[in-house]
Amino acid sequence: MANSAQARKRARQAAKANSHNSALRSKFRTAIKAVRKAIDAGDQAKAAELFKAATKTIDTIADKKIVHKNKAARHKSRLSAAVKGLQAQAAQ
């Protein structure tokens, strides 16, 4: 329990930041799932469009240090490879 005014304020700020960061983390996961769903459906155009939007979301949360930059890079790399694989599969 926070006893001083400073500690109470820090507790309020931490709760607010936690709520905001949780929302951004959820947006990150949702963006990845949307791209994966489009890839699984075989929709090349939609997958490329959603990948572009997901990349912005992933970069944003990495810049804000909500997820580590390496984790963000790993997700972007794997999604990019999956989208390119879908395009290569469609070309054959």
From Swiss-Prot:
Q: Where is this region: Disordered?
A: 1-25
Q: Which HAMAP family match?
A: Ribosomal_bS20
| Domain of life assignment | Bacteria
Task: Tell me which Pfam families the record gives.
Answer: Ribosomal_S20p
Under the heading SUPFAM superfamilies, the entry gives: Ribosomal protein S20 (SSF46992)
What job does this protein perform? Answer: Binds directly to 16S ribosomal RNA.
InterPro entries membership: Ribosomal_bS20, Ribosomal_bS20_sf
Q: GO MF annotations for this entry?
A: small ribosomal subunit rRNA binding; structural constituent of ribosome
Can the keyword DNA-binding be found in this entry's annotation? no
In Gene Ontology terms, what is a biological process of this protein? translation
Query: What keywords sit in the KW lines?
Result: Ribonucleoprotein, Ribosomal protein, RNA-binding, rRNA-binding
Q: Which organism is it from?
A: Burkholderia mallei (strain ATCC 23344)
The protein's name: Small ribosomal subunit protein bS20
One GO cellular component term of this record is:
small ribosomal subunit
Q: Does the keyword Transport apply?
A: no
Name the protein family: Belongs to the bacterial ribosomal protein bS20 family.
